[in-house]
């Protein structure tokens, strides 16, 4: 969410949109079912791996999570906040202005484009006009990395993948105000969210050595993310996709085979171990 846009400075509007999106449709259409759903792994700031999922208290944030396509809940939330359609044109107003937004991603990035169409469809179902726009990447990357911008309201970027700095690096990337006001910002928080409480947590995590306290800090970070909704994940998107052709060779690595061989490239690092286990289909 671009928090330079007045309408999106309202957290009720942000959360209602996030609640209304059909994430299962995104999983099936944009991801072709190749990642966990939010029903499988409820949303947080963490990726779906066991290590990151163990870093926070799931029960403490359970009531703050949503799995999507909750049109009744989103509409009720907007109604309760007085964000209603007062002139009967089918679109809600906020502070006397029609809620009309765009949803953007680079042209040709077909999985992202499919996701943005689903976001736009969700807006229509809760009385918020959302129109998709797909600029070329050369333009897009200049706009979203600017210190401020009012061209794109809802737009897609990425988060950190799996590294030793996670999940701290991802919390920082999603919410740290240190990136605000920076021209050519490729580091994160492209929506320009600012919250001194999360900034304090981001500073505390790297120097905290007590495991219980660290879990408390991560849990509080997840709470802030789910309550304020500065951005929202559309999918668990792998950094790499893995596919094999088993017409000639078989017994490629699998996450559940107990061998713990990284599957992304059988000629890189410990991935080479996979070559020793391959079996000819017709020896």
Residue ranges: model-predicted function:
Residues 70-75, 118:
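Thiotemplate assembly-line natural product biosynthesis machinery
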Residues 18-58, 111-120, 145-283:
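Detector for C-terminal structural segments
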Residues 1-3, 188:
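Well-structured core secondary-structure elements of compact alpha/beta domains
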Residues 5-13:
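Short helix-loop capping/hinge motifs at secondary-structure junctions, enriched
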Residues 65-67, 83-161, 190, 211, ...:
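Ligand/substrate-recognition segments at binding pockets and active sites
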Residues 12, 16, 139:
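Amphipathic alpha-helical recognition patches that constitute DNA-binding helices
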């Amino acid at each position: 969410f671009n928090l330079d846009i007045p309408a999106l400075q309202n957290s009720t509007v942000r959360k209602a949109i996030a609640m209304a999106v059909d994430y299962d449709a995104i999983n099936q259409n944009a991801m072709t079912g190749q990642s966990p759903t939010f029903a499988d792994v409820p949303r947080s700031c963490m990726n779906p791996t066991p290590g990151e999922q163990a870093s926070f208290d799931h029960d403490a944030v359970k009531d703050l999570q949503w799995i999507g396509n909750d049109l009744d809940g989103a509409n009720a939330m907007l109604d309760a906040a007085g964000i209603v359609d007062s002139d009967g044109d089918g679109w809600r107003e906020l502070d006397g202005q029609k809620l009309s937004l765009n949803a953007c991603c680079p042209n040709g990035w077909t999985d992202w484009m499919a996701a943005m169409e689903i976001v736009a469809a969700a807006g229509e179902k809760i009385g918020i006009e959302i129109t998709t726009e797909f600029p070329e990447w050369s333009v897009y990357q200049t706009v979203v990395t600017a210190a401020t911008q009012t061209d794109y309201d809802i737009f897609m970027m990425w988060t950190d993948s799996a590294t030793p700095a996670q999940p701290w690096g991802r919390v920082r990337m999603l919410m740290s105000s240190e990136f605000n006001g920076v021209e050519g910002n490729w580091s994160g928080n492209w929506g320009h969210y600012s919250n001194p409480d999360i900034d304090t947590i981001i500073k505390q995590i790297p120097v905290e050595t007590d495991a219980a306290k660290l879990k408390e800090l991560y849990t509080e970070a997840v709470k802030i993310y789910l309550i304020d909704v500065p951005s929202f994940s559309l999918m668990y998107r792998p950094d790499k996709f893995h596919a094999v052709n088993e017409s000639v060779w078989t017994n490629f690595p699998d996450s559940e085979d107990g061998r713990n061989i990284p599957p992304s490239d059988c000629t890189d690092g410990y991935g080479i171990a996979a070559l020793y286990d391959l079996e000819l289909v017709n020896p």
